[in-house]
Amino acid sequence: MLPKLILLATLYISQFIPTTFFIQALPVFMRQQKMSLDVIGFLGLLILPSGLKFLWSPFIDRYRLGKLGHYRGWIICFQLLLISTMLVTAFIDIQDNLNAFLTCMFLASLFSSSQDIATDALAVNLLEPQERGLGNAIQSGGNIFGAIIGGGVMLILLDKIGWRYSLITLSIFMLINLVPILIYREKSQHQLENSTFFRSYFQPFISFLSRPKALPWLFVVLLYMMGDSVTSLMIRPLLVDRGLSLPDIGWILGIVSYSARIVSALIAGLVIVKLGRIKSLIIFGFIADLTTLLYIIPAIGVSSLLVLYTVCIIVNATQSMAYTALLSAMMDKCEKNTAATDYTMQVSVMFLGGIAATVLSGMLATTMGYSFIFIMSAAVSLLSVFLITQEYGVSS
């Protein structure tokens, strides 16, 4: 079990670092440059590959890259492309070549989200059903540790050693993290039957959507983490408006808050085994949505570091528990032979909901204020908890 968890942890750390770095560092930088909230909200569109990756997941399910293994081969390929993109980005001057920078950021998101398809599929096949609670806690923890590096440590490094050397350091770390998958030997999986392109491409989607309660479940996935998506983006310009420095924001949101996410994800993994998926989704989701409202405290003008640390730790910890429960439930919806497509389609729906919510929240924050968007995002996510109780029942 331990080797499996170490492998998955390194994979999820590596793929989450660059996207987190761009999405978390850039809003802070843009707000410091006095850019408007509606413009910052549109940053969500740059992670569009995460919302559309289900479109190419059937190819990753069906095809393999020579002798590298099936999902292992795709992971190695996309990880090397990701590292190469980061190294190129290191030598781009953001102010003089903003378009080139945004292009590289989009490519990094594309390669990272594509690697995520193969990694999730590998995890589905690697973990037994009874291992998935802890396995998804490791996934959440790996993502969060990647976020600590990409969104916390990197903000501090940017302030100390500058853009170029920060990204070179990041690329070296990601290269080292590639070692476990290079030495891993993937077991051969049952191959899908040969068929026409049309049938082979659409069959996994049709199969998933034809399962009982598939559409209501996807609607739950669409709404469940919207509160997290909105607050994760908008709390950054809010803290800039409260006068916090780049290192301060890096420590609060990138290191301390995400450390709380790791601990709470591991706790959630153990609790999920005891409570089951549905009860965990309801309880963790309800608590997370209520604590989201704590962000109203800095929104109304409170700038005490002690208060901000406390609020951010509580919100991030509870949102992480809800996220872990959702990942576990999503994995249960997957078939082994179409693991990449089944899981990725659910993740894509979740990301599309988050992208739409962040873009809309940026526009609303400009006119209605931060407090309004925090209340609305919590209300929308609470709707998904209500839907779970209606479709599956609290006693499930």
Swiss-Prot record:
Q: Which residues lie on this side of the membrane: Cytoplasmic?
A: 26-39, 95-104, 159-162, 236-251, 303-304
Question: Which stretches are annotated as coiled coil?
Answer: none
Residue ranges annotated as transmembrane are 40-60, 74-94, 105-127, 138-158, 163-183, 215-235, 252-272, 282-302, 305-325, 347-367, 368-388
A GO cellular-component term linked to this record: plasma membrane
Where in or outside the cell? Answer: Cell inner membrane
Secretion signal, residue range per the UniProt entry: 1-25
Name the UniProt record assigns to this protein: Schizokinen exporter SchE
